[in-house]
Amino acid sequence: MLTLLGLGMILCFMYLIMTRRMSALVALTLIPVIFALIAYVLGFFFDSLSHIEIQNLGEMMLEGVKKLAPTGIMLLFAILYFAIMIDTGLFDPSVKWILRLVKGDPLKVTLGTITLTLIVSLDGDGSTTYMICVAAMLPLYKRLGMSPLVMACLMMLSSGIMNLTPWGGPTARAASALHVDPSDVFVPMIVPMICAIAWVYFMGYMYGRMERKRLGIITLDISHGDNIQISSNPEANRAHLRWFNTLLTVVLMICLVKSVLPMSVLFMIALCIALVVNYKDINMQKDLIAHHAGSALNVVGIIFAAGIFTGILAGTGMVDSMSKELVAIIPESMGPFLAPITAILSMPLTFFMSNDAFYYGVLPVLSEAALHYGISPVEMARAAIVGQPVHLLSPLVPSTYLLCGLAGIDFGQHQKFAIKWAILTCLVMMLGGLIFGGFPFYSTLP
């Protein structure tokens, strides 16, 4: 019964936001509360639900919010930081350079989007990647009249592939859950990742051709490129301090990669330094923060609402129940195929549950079963990270809300547009893993 309620809650949520009957903030808050109350009432009739008590629901929700609080704080100050950097004109030269390079060709823009995202996402953090890449590319998409849905899709897929580096979350979780070395998981997956990257470039080429056909190669007056500004607030431009802002941002990125301090603290410090150096007038500092507060609070509000969703999902035992039931339905005759089965399951399972729930709850059970057929834990770990491009479309991923907010697109629209391409990207990576020996298609007892 817990499994049915968990699946019902997730499917109901997905339906409401994809059909735009509810906003993500409202759905993430109300739907889990309603299903938790349903579970409480059904607990009088089903023993499997008798452990759910009304007085415990608040603790479950608060626990979920606490877990996502650092992420919410980080996003609040990160959005404000990059918004201030845009106002100062930090990214104006990069946009001008890209503008001169693409010369109004949508095909070059889509391919450039992928390249930029692949490079920036090497730091392993999706939120930072989206903030930098959207800041650089969105003005160009708007100027050419290209669809921001295409931009968001290409960025998400590129980030999903590059997030498989050893310092990225999925590989580290899979390795720690199965007690294997992250480098042993990652190195054999390099070629499959290259295959997936090649596929994303093909997608970018295809969409670039479509946008070129729709819009044509637009003639941009490059001679006026020096007048191009990303910011809509020219009074906040600080071109003479660009060297300082560049240095500050580079140091911030290095500190993020080296984990010198928690991300939220680093962005808080960097934001305060940026405000003090660039804007001496306290009133101007207040005005700029107020100007960007709307977009920041919109994203952060969704993050805290997601805490309620995940808190109830985990606290009621729905996640554990779903993982056990899904593992149990795999017939014993399919045991030798557990590696590709795990790769396929990683798509829906990491969509419907968090990475932590999948890698620490489901993967060890699958890996233990696979051992009986001669499939090693490291091979299972490689198979388990294949579904990450689909995972990034999950309503449980905070950075996806950030991407949609920055790009100015609806979360449900993004899901509908990108889901088929995310699945195909995962399948290409899985095929690469099978062909190049990342994990076996079929295995027997050693």
Task: Place the predicted regions along the sequence by residue.
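Membrane-interfacial loop-to-helix junctions in multi-pass transporters
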Residues: 1-4, 66-72, 98-112, 143-151, ...
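Long, contiguous bundles of hydrophobic transmembrane helices that form the permeation core
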Residues: 3-9, 28-31, 35-39, 43-48, ...
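Transmembrane alpha-helix interface/packing and boundary motifs in multi-pass membrane proteins
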Residues: 13-21, 82-83, 116-125, 156-162, ...
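Membrane-helix interface "capping/anchor" motifs
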Residues: 15-26, 141-150, 280-281, 290-291, ...
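Core transmembrane alpha-helical segments of multi-pass membrane transporters/permeases
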Residues: 57-92, 118, 264-265, 272, ...
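Hydrophobic alpha-helical transmembrane segments of multi-pass integral membrane proteins
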Residues: 74-77, 103-136, 329-373, 377, ...
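Re-entrant/interfacial helical elements at transmembrane boundaries that shape
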Residues: 93-95, 128-140, 168-178, 322, ...
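Membrane-core helix-loop-helix motifs of multi-pass transport proteins
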Residues: 139-225, 230, 235-236, 376, ...
